C-alpha cells in the first residue's frame, strides 16, 4: 500500500536515517580523538642531536629518532652544515637535562622524515615546555599544534619578554625555520 509523501511511515524512515547519521558521526569523532592520543613509552636517551631531536632506546631495544612535538630549536652545527646562534647551547642544555636518562615519551606519530613526534617527560617535567621557557626553543608553527599549545605559547611569550636564552639577540634573532630556508637545510 502506497502512503502519501509526508505520512508517518516516511517520517519514521527519515528519523531512522538521521539517527544512523548522528551515530556514525559520533563514532567518527571518537575514533579520530583516540587516534590523536599519544602512545606512551619509556626509553633511555642515547644521544642528543639538536635542541629538539634525540635518539632513545626503548625497553625492548627499539631505537627511536625523536623530534620534539610543538617546538623548534636553533640549528646546531653538524659536520657539513653550519649552525646558528644558540644552536650548540640548546643541544648542550637538552643533553644536560636528559642525556643518558630514562624518560617518558608521549609519541604522537611520525613526521615526514620518519622521526617520532613526541612530548618528552623527565619525571614530572615537560622537557618540550622547559626548552621553550628557558629560551632554547620557540613554538613550532609549521604544523597545527597537537599538545600543550597554550602552555608552549605562554612560555615563549615570557621568555621573549624576559630576553632569556636565544631571545637575548633581540632584532638579530632568526627563527630556525628562516635559518633552514636561508641555508637550504632539510628538516623541521
Task: Show the residue positions of the predicted features.
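Small beta-barrel nucleic-acid-binding modules, primarily SNase/OB-fold domains
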Residues: 2-188
